[in-house]
Amino acid sequence: MRFDEAYSGKVFIASRPEWEEADAILYGMPMDWTVSYRPGSRFGPSRIREVSIGLEEYSPYLDRDLADLNFFDAGDIPLPFGNPQRSLDMIEEYVDSILEKGKFPMGMGGEHLVSWPVIKAMYKKYPDLAIIHFDAHTDLRVDYEGEPLSHSTPIRKAAELIGPHNVYSFGIRSGMKEEFEWAKENGMHISKFEVLEPLKEVLPKLAGRPVYVTIDIDVLDPAHAPGTGTVDAGGITSKELLASVHEIARSEVNVKGADLVEVAPVYDHSEQTANTASKIIREMLLGFVK
């Protein structure tokens, strides 16, 4: 890596030049092969990196600086275009390798289906895993028009793997009636519309447990994040989402990995969504990687 590459927009700002000593690995999952509405999230990771050079390295929320954190931006996993299953397998294998080295995986999507293989890898390492999920949508379908590999199915797959009672979804305001009924019947926690106050109630219950945090950027209202594939009105503000990340960071839960997905730059004409996403990623790195 060139000396100035950490500030070039080619990697996330302040990335270290070598991975061996890094505590966290930032990586992209540029896949949007199964989106049901507007594609383009495969370009999300690269745009988030590009705009990250506009960030300050210091977080006044957490009183911590990226200079204090040893993380490495590994770039994007070279996923085979149009091949969902092979792409998911490659993601799982890569995250397995990160976890084997004792490093924190911080992923960038890509559509939300990319979280599924990451969760599988996390669950192998941490069988007591719980998931904190921020999203506009339930993502609890069994399939989408007969296809089980869809960005509308990852949380259903995760819930069936680790147990619905170990999945906590926040900000949900869209989904099929059957999805909400399945969650209720199976003991899954869904907080409709709201995020911060319900999260505060849940976090003490997860104290000491390994947790994976997945954020779909469309949990934000389209006024705050227009650059995503499936916008849904009535969402939360970026201030509320940042406060939620900080609430997790200051809690007693043991965050072991995280991702942020569904940034689609083609619909993000002012780069508002990518800029918001890059700040959230900075806060997750500084807040979750101890």
Curated annotation (Swiss-Prot):
It comes from the Bacteria. It holds the Pfam family Arginase. Its cofactor is Mn(2+). Its EC number is 3.5.3.11. It is an enzyme of class 3 (hydrolase). Mn(2+) binds at residues 112, 135, 137, 139, 216, 218. The keyword 4Fe-4S does not apply. Gene3D superfamilies: Ureohydrolase domain. Keywords: Hydrolase, Manganese, Metal-binding, Polyamine biosynthesis, Putrescine biosynthesis, Spermidine biosynthesis. SUPFAM superfamilies: Arginase/deacetylase. Pathway: Amine and polyamine biosynthesis; putrescine biosynthesis via agmatine pathway; putrescine from agmatine: step 1/1. GO terms for molecular function: agmatinase activity; metal ion binding. Coiled coil: none annotated. One of its GO terms (biological process) is spermidine biosynthetic process. It catalyses: agmatine + H2O = urea + putrescine. Catalyzes the formation of putrescine from agmatine. Belongs to the arginase family. Agmatinase subfamily. This is Agmatinase. The lineage of its organism: Bacteria, Bacillati, Bacillota, Bacilli, Bacillales. The gene is speB.
